[in-house]
A protein has these predicted regions:
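Active-site beta3 strand of CheY-like receiver
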Residues: 44-50, 55
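C-terminal output helix
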Residues: 106-115
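The feature encodes the CheY-like receiver
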Residues: 56, 74, 86
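Charged docking surfaces used in two-component/phosphorelay signaling
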Residues: 15-23
Length: 131
């Protein structure tokens, strides 16, 4: 079962997205701010992280940078999520270390396609490094 770390401070968004992911067969772990997301990424070892970019304590931009700078979490794919579909946000998310980017409200099939692609890429990379 694919483990998703959902880092989202908005209870309604967190509830709605997690229920939809669970119905599609994902295991979901929650964090409500960027620091908690970093801590849970280290302890829970998720397959993918869905990172809201507007978070308290440490925002998603900085949390993504820290995750990608940490040997323990750098290989975990991060998908940045934001309600702001501004020009340049995707590029900003990639520069912050996100592997992909999506807008809210989330279109679930599109998001799952991104998750599956990134998990496949991460597993391929892990196999190459193991050889």
């Amino acid at each position: 079962m694919t483990k998703v770390l959902l880092v989202e401070d908005n209870e309604m968004n967190r509830d709605m997205l997690s229920r939809r992911l669970i119905r599609r067969g994902f295991q979901v772990v929650f964090a409500m701010d960027g620091q908690q997301g970093i801590d849970l990424a280290r302890s829970e070892r998720p397959d993918v992280i869905l990172m809201d970019m507007s978070l308290p304590v440490i925002d998603g931009w900085e949390a993504s940078r820290r995750l990608k700078a940490d040997d323990a979490t750098r290989s975990v794919p991060v998908i940045g999520l934001t309600a702001h579909a501004m020009s340049g946000d995707r590029e900003k998310a990639i520069e912050a270390g996100c592997d992909d980017y999506d807008t809210k409200p989330v279109e679930l099939d599109r998001l799952i396609t991104k998750i599956e692609r990134l998990i496949g890429t991460a597993k391929d990379e892990a196999l190459r490094q193991a050889v």
